[in-house]
């Protein structure tokens, strides 16, 4: 019992550290000092550190996912493909309001990613934003806010909370255009939450998130953006 409480406390500290990192390193530093380089470097370094720590803290859940792949590989593939297609469809639908109302608006999160790609080396950028960043976000928004929190709250509340926070997390301004352009994050969050709840494999959302981010970075490389 004491050991379980200790683990829960450590994971709570992990979530708190993530919140502090995002609010101070990204938001406050960017708004107060108006220095995007320092803000992005803090974010990249923090994602690398928190990603490694998170993998260690949630190693039991990750091992469970790996074991699930070994035992039910076909089932995992079906869930992954189904989730990917569903996410693409829902994200496209969620993107319509932004395209209709603000067709020329570029999301501040995308601008930040492009800026980061130009400021740091490609290997560091891919490691932080393509691999460890998604892992960290999945541990926070899906592992903790859904898989763990559903023991205390109804699953539907956990899904709504996780998905809304996941969307807000990617907003860099409290404006209607910024809200609209991040609606696809809300739909993606819902899809990933459903996977956590019903697939019995917690690593699927991680793999999909990493795949989506690294694919986007590959496109940026091919287009000469980074």
List where the protein language model places each region.
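Alpha-helical transmembrane segments
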Residues: 7-25, 79-85, 159-163
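Alpha-helical transmembrane segments in multi-pass membrane proteins
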Residues: 10-61, 107-111
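Juxtamembrane/transmembrane-helix boundary motifs at the membrane-water interface
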Residues: 21-43, 98-102, 176-177, 218-226
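Transmembrane helix-loop-helix hairpins at the membrane interface
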Residues: 92, 118-226
